[in-house]
Amino acid sequence: MDILTTILNLLLPPLTIIFLFLFYPFYLLIKLVLCLRKNLHFENVARKVVLITGASSGIGEHVAYEYAKKGAYLALVARRRDRLEIVAETSRQLGSGNVIIIPGDVSNVEDCKKFIDETIRHFGKLDHLINNAGVFQTVLFEDFTQIQDANPIMDINFWGTTYITYFAIPHLRKSKGKIVAITSGSANIPLPLASIYAASKAALLRFFETLRIELSPDIKITIVLPGVVSTDMTTPHCIEKYGSDFILSESVSKCAKAIFRGIGRGETYIEEPSWMKWLFIMKNVCPEIVDYGLNYLFVSYLKPYFKRD
């Protein structure tokens, strides 16, 4: 095995360079052709059953509205019943002919089973699962009073998503359906002051990349990597810590529209805003430069706002 490893160490670097110079242009051309083809074959979601977690606000709420405009049937999941009722009514007004709400907590495995069971009981099928539920917290890792305080971030962001995905898979196989995972740009790029959050999103990214291979070709998986979006989850943290929402952010409605377009085209990855894709590439090609830039941003602009007790 050591000999094989040595051979790979010697061969892969030059072969990779040869591939990049000789074959990568053809790869990009194929990608362009496939992109044009996807734009011509947008998925018709009318009367398709879509379950959305974290649907009471933010990206989940606005993605629900985009589906509603196209006539999809919706199962809306979140903890806040009052907010779900408002989103459901708005979705009906926008064009959804059938909307149900299922209050509950994605970090509770029994609730996740209930979400799927009630959706199937009401609609008889499931076509799209939009895994959007998540929580965000800005804190220096060493400033956790009790390290256990970080558990809810992983419980909701990672385990909550895997629980409901597990129960949804048999039904999505029947419908040849789709899973959409709303992760974060922090899954690929370090996010100072949100280490546990970034770790939870990185775990989701690798989980769904692996699951995509396991479930292919029966179930398609789209992974979304948004940047900072102006939502109820992120904006209060910026105001509390920095006095204003100064971080470069995108409106939630614009982000949701881009996500919906990407889902309809059958994209495997959706980076929104699109410039983040190039930041991810730079991180892979010259990681030290990206790390230096993030460190400068953190030390110069962010860290001074955090006063240690």
UniProtKB/Swiss-Prot annotation:
Keyword field: Lipid biosynthesis, Lipid metabolism, Membrane, NADP, Oxidoreductase, Signal-anchor, Steroid biosynthesis, Transmembrane, Transmembrane helix
GO CC field: membrane
PROSITE patterns: ADH_SHORT
Membrane-protein topology: Single-pass type II membrane protein
Binding site for NADP(+): 54-80, 105, 197-201
GO terms of molecular function: oxidoreductase activity
Compartments, as annotated in UniProt: Membrane
Top EC class, one word: oxidoreductase
Binding site for substrate: 184
KW Transmembrane (keyword) present: yes
Active site: 197 (proton acceptor)
Main location: membrane
UniProt xrefs under SUPFAM superfamilies: NAD(P)-binding Rossmann-fold domains
A Pfam family annotated for this UniProt entry: adh_short
Keyword match Ubl conjugation: no
Membrane-spanning intervals of the chain: 10-30
Domain of life where this protein originates: Eukaryota
GO biological process: steroid biosynthetic process
Catalytic activity, EC: 1.1.1.-
Entry similarity comment: Belongs to the short-chain dehydrogenases/reductases (SDR) family.
Protein name: 11-beta-hydroxysteroid dehydrogenase-like 3
Organism: Arabidopsis thaliana
Annotated gene: HSD3
